């Protein structure tokens, strides 16, 4: 079974320590997030994960994109749409992705391992932002589709930078706040432009949306099951077998480290529904809020459990 992560990892930016780093800081070229990316990559590789991330160390999933998009800004921690949304002047995440790949290749020569590119989805970006201009707060469809066009450009940048796959994070899809038809069209704007596999990550209770999620034009649905075991029953009723399933099997909302047997038992239930060959094994969600040791231990046990199939 292939193992992966959802994205974020508890690796914090670091102030310059060495003489070279202090000189770089003095001339304005030191990047405090580079050491955090290296920590995230090293931990994921050490745990044995197949498809890793750069750790998403540069801030929250909405603000990081809003700061770069045309027509958007972040003020007092709030993402704001003030004009028409347009693509950023350059790629938001390609440099970090390339650096993560560089570190990965230093650590292993296994070409089957790679780094995923991650974008926050258009519906989540639009619904998590305050609209102050150009679009109607009551009717966000136009904002969502313009967001999709801008994010498509970023996804293409990530693909060109060497991403093994692209993940679209859409946590808002399980909330009931989103028009699913618009969300589907927006995702298609992105996935239809890519050659690599595309995964759609949706956390939360999927009981009200699983039927529609299964119609989204993506190669994989990534869902949480450790923290929400009821999602297994929902999936069993609707699963059609035409996609891969990102199977969240460690709970990222608690520091408690699941045993290998606990994880393995959950994976077995998922395999009974979707088939072993269709499962990609990963955590429920991002791991940013966990202590680093807990995050690493969860990944290590997850990989060990997956290896027993």
UniProtKB/Swiss-Prot annotation:
The protein's name: Methionine synthase
Any one Gene Ontology molecular-function term assigned to this protein's record: 5-methyltetrahydropteroyltriglutamate-homocysteine S-methyltransferase activity
Record key words, sorted: Amino-acid biosynthesis, Metal-binding, Methionine biosynthesis, Methyltransferase, Transferase, Zinc
Co-factor requirement: Zn(2+)
Signal peptide range in chain numbering: none
Entry note: cofactor: Binds 1 zinc ion per subunit.
Organism, scientific name: Methanothermobacter marburgensis (strain ATCC BAA-927 / DSM 2133 / JCM 14651 / NBRC 100331 / OCM 82 / Marburg) (Methanobacterium thermoautotrophicum)
GO biological process: methionine biosynthetic process; methylation
Residues involved in Zn(2+) binding: 201, 203, 224, 285
Enzyme Commission code: 2.1.1.-
Pathway: Amino-acid biosynthesis; L-methionine biosynthesis via de novo pathway
């Amino acid at each position: 079974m292939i193992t992966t992560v959802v994205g974020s990892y508890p690796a914090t930016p670091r102030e310059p320590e060495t003489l070279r780093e202090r000189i770089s800081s003095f001339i304005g070229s030191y990047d405090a997030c580079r050491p955090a990316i290296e920590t995230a990559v090293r931990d994921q590789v050490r745990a044995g994960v197949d498809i890793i991330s750069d750790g998403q160390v540069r801030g929250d999933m909405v603000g990081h994109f809003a700061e770069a998009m045309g027509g958007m800004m972040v003020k007092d921690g709030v993402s704001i749409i003030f004009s028409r949304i347009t693509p950023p002047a350059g790629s938001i995440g390609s440099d970090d992705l390339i650096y993560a790949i560089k570190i990965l290749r230093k650590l292993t020569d296994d070409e089957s391992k790679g780094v995923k590119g991650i974008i926050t989805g258009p519906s989540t970006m639009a619904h998590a932002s305050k609209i102050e201009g150009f679009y109607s707060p009551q009717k966000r469809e136009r904002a969502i589709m313009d967001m999709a066009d801008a994010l498509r450009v970023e996804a293409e940048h990530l693909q060109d930078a060497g991403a093994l796959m692209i993940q679209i994070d859409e946590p808002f899809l399980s909330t009931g706040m989103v028009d699913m038809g618009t969300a589907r069209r927006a995702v298609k704007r992105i996935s239809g432009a890519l050659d690599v596999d595309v995964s759609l990550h949706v956390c939360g209770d999927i009981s009200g949306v699983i039927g529609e999620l299964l119609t989204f034009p993506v190669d994989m649905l990534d869902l949480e099951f450790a923290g929400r075991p009821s999602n297994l029953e929902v999936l069993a009723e609707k699963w059609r077998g035409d996609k891969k399933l990102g199977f969240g099997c460690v709970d990222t909302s608690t520091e408690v480290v699941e045993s290998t047997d606990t994880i393995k038992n959950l994976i077995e239930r998922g395999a009974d529904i979707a088939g072993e060959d269709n499962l990609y094994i990963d955590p429920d969600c991002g791991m940013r809020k966990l202590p680093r040791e807990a995050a690493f231990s969860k990944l290590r046990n997850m990989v060990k459990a997956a290896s027993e199939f």
